[in-house]
């Protein structure tokens, strides 16, 4: 079973564009690590500084190792992500069937 990490957070005022760039750099680094299957970040369409960040890992072990690599490499550059947030993030970790989950993203020819 794969592990899906879902984070919903909001940024402080006037740093939302920078925060999204930093989130995207985190997700890009995650995608390059062994054990990360998918990673993306998105900003709310209603203009609010609300963000959705999701990462799919092969296992709990990969979640821990990839998260450690990302924080060690990127936090020294810009500080911890929490320093950009207006409050604590809502974080959920879900166990999903890897094949079924990834199949949802395959386009079917009609």
Residue spans for each PLM region:
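Short, well-ordered beta-strand segments in beta-rich or mixed alpha/beta enzyme
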Residues: 2-10, 38-71, 108
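Short, surface-exposed ligand-recognition loops at beta-strand->loop->(often short) alpha-helix junctions
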Residues: 10-22
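Non-catalytic surface loops within mature trypsin-like serine protease
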Residues: 11-13, 59, 95-98
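Intrinsically disordered, low-complexity segments enriched in polar/charged residues with Gly/Pro
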Residues: 15-17, 27-29, 41-43
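An amphipathic, aromatic/His-enriched active-site/gating alpha helix that lines ligand/cofactor pockets
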Residues: 25-37, 56-93
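Glycine-rich beta-strand-turn "strand-cap" elements at beta-sheet edges
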Residues: 38-50, 76-110
């Amino acid at each position: 079973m794969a592990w899906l990490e879902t984070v919903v957070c909001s940024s402080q005022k006037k740093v939302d564009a920078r925060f999204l760039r930093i989130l995207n750099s985190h997700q890009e680094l995650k995608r390059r690590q062994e054990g990360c299957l998918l990673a993306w970040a998105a900003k709310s369409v209603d203009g609010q500084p609300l963000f959705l960040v999701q990462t799919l890992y092969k296992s709990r072990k990969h979640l821990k190792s990839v998260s450690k690599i990302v924080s060690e490499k990127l936090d020294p550059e810009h500080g911890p992500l929490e320093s950009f947030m207006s409050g604590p993030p809502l974080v959920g970790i879900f166990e999903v069937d890897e094949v079924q989950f990834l199949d949802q993203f395959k386009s079917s020819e009609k």
